[in-house]
């Protein structure tokens, strides 16, 4: 996880801040993961020329939410009825009441070569909050994103873009590991606190990815604290070795033992 602390009056679409966080996030990846295809997803705050150009310069794949301005509205309304394809959910199943269309006629002059605009149309579900969003005469709501991915399967591209909402899970996890309240009065001290929170979240993510399975691999920090970190244990020495003895009756003691075994089995450098 990477992040920077910004003043309260900072804009949501400040490209330089996005570029800085991007560089930090790429450096946080293991070297082996920095090669090949890397996809960067962002909401419409990332739809700035400077940020998208930086993604293009680095050779990264991108999927960025796009604001629906007047020209985009016209392009959406110009879409033919047979140009819409049923959308899919994250499991590849058809999603009722949702369709996808590529706005190939939208003028994207000024954006990097190969930039495409893809639109999602859906019927709001009954409990949806009413917002001042663009709708057509049938009440459909629309979302648009731009991408440089060449995959002709726009349904898969749209589902992949929508999956970026999992960042909300990381934000929630960060709040549970210290980000909910910045404890200091000074900006620099709170910036250091943010770095510690990012380290904590990074440890949680890699622990879940490499050492845990099942429910624990997707559990919230509070659950991990209770089931694993609160496990009663005792350090003993035997044969010049330090041994951690866990409470045998603790329901998740076996999961913790397995996590240690997986951790010790990892190569020295990943």
Each model region followed by its residue ranges:
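Short, conserved catalytic/metal-binding motifs centered on acidic residues
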Residues: 38-47, 62, 145, 167-174, ...
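An anionic, glycine-rich sequence signature occurring as long contiguous blocks
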Residues: 63-175, 258-270
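Short amphipathic alpha-helical "interface-anchor" segments enriched in bulky aromatics
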Residues: 154-207
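Electropositive, glycine- and tryptophan-enriched low-complexity nucleic-acid-binding patches
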Residues: 1-33
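Short, surface-exposed basic-aromatic patches at helix termini and helix-loop junctions that form
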Residues: 52-61
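Short, conserved secondary-structure transition motifs
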Residues: 44-49, 67-76, 231
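Glycine-rich, histidine-containing beta strand-loop boundary motifs that form or position
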Residues: 4-7, 42, 64-68
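A short, flexible helix-boundary coil/loop motif
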Residues: 203-270
